[in-house]
Amino acid sequence: MRFVFTAVRFTGFLFWCAAAVLTVLGLLSHFSKTRPWARWARRLLLALLAAGFAFFAVLEVWVISWARTDEETPVEAVVVLGAGVNGTQPSLSLWTRLEAALDYLQDRPDLPVVVTGSQGRGEDISEARCMYDWLTSRGVPPERVILEERADDTEQNVRYSKALLSGMGIGEDSSVAIVTSGYHLCRASRLWGEGAVPVAARMPARYFPISINYYIREAFAMAEAIVFR
């Protein structure tokens, strides 16, 4: 339910932003008949909107291009990025990541697995602990699964997981499988660096409209990461 609520809230935000822009354009169109400054302001706003849409389109293509699983590249470890936990059970988003991780691990029985994510509000256990319990209950040997329970966001997921792997002799130049939602892979892989090997978790078909919402939201997150980081 949290996944659906977040998607609906973001859609509402986009709706109000679009309504505000259309209102301003309407006012400028009205005043442009008698006031030259309004004509120039309207042209400037339209130019900015066109540039913004073009930038968004490029980012969206970039995000979509990473939503795939690379089965061919050999890796030295697997990192599963956390998502919400409902009490002690994985949320829909986290469940899809765990399913993708389990499927990827089937043919790679010797790889270490880092599960990363702290305990958030409304969660009875950490995201890492939830993933550990889920994977080990489905046959993954406990000694293969390394918990990282401090990370609160994607940047920390990457930083703390790299530190754990470094302690195991897996360095910056090593190839590591990054398991996360398809829409999230572009940003996560960009933060990880050249060694990132994508493993995409996909939503069930009935959640396709919500998935579109999340792909749109991720393009804005990528823009923020590029501009402010």
Q: Can you say where each PLM-predicted feature lies in the sequence?
A:
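Membrane-embedded alpha-helical segments of integral membrane proteins
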Residues: M1-F31
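Generic intrinsically disordered, low-complexity segments enriched for polar/acidic and small residues
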Residues: R2, A7-F13, F53, A101, ...
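Juxtamembrane loop-transmembrane helix junctions in multi-pass integral membrane proteins
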Residues: F3-T6, K33-R43
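Acidic, low-complexity intrinsically disordered regions
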Residues: G12, K33-P36, V58
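Structural signature of transmembrane alpha-helix termini at the membrane-water interface
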Residues: V24-F31, A54-S65, A223-V227
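Internal/C-terminal transmembrane anchor helices
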Residues: R39-V61
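A structural signal for short, hydrophobic/glycine-enriched beta-strand patches
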Residues: V58-I216
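A transmembrane-helix-recognition feature enriched in membrane-embedded lipid enzymes
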Residues: S211-R229
